[in-house]
């Protein structure tokens, strides 16, 4: 919600409900069970959340031009992760066409410049503050479950790249983003 204030904008009422619902953060016992307890413990670092480096990471990605629904989801997701003691940050929200083409050449994405939700502020890549991209499949699956639970609670239509054939577990995007940006089709 602070991002709306920084931009001098009033958040929509439904996003206010998402940002401050009575049942968020979701209790850890409802969020994590079984074998995922070990995955959670392996990515937790509550003391890191209190440090200057974590604070700086939170401001790393440019939020200019990011879809407000996506920012609302990101804010709620981050609150849930902090409540669980998991330090994460966004590597990129908005990405230039040239940067997209560079990543495609490296094989980290399939989308060409101009055809990615990142070019339109409709996606973000979430990275662990200390482990970076190097999480296990179980750790990413846990993060996917947490993010999808937050989205469901807020009735937000968000897709997770960990569910795709081209596995991209750091990636989150607005579902149906092409319909919201007609010239991207």
Task: Label the model's feature ranges.
Residues 70, 92, 136, 140:
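Charged, low-complexity surface patches
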């Amino acid at each position: 919600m602070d991002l709306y204030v920084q931009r001098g904008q009033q958040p929509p009422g439904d996003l206010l409900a998402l940002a401050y619902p009575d049942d968020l953060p979701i209790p850890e016992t409802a969020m994590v069970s079984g074998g995922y307890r070990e995955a959670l413990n392996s990515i937790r670092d509550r003391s890191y959340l209190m440090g200057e480096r974590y604070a700086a990471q939170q401001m790393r990605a440019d939020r200019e031009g990011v879809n407000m629904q996506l920012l609302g989801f990101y804010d709620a997701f981050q609150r849930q992760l902090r409540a669980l003691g998991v330090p994460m940050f966004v590597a990129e929200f908005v990405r230039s066409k040239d940067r997209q083409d560079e990543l495609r050449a490296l094989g980290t994405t399939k989308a060409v410049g101009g055809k990615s939700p990142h070019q339109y502020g409709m996606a973000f890549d979430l990275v662990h503050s200390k482990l970076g991209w190097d999480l296990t499949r179980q750790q990413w699956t846990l993060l996917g479950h947490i993010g999808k639970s937050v989205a469901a609670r807020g009735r937000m239509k968000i897709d997770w790249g960990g569910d795709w054939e081209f596995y991209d577990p750091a990636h989150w995007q607005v579902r149906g983003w092409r319909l919201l940006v007609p010239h991207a089709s």
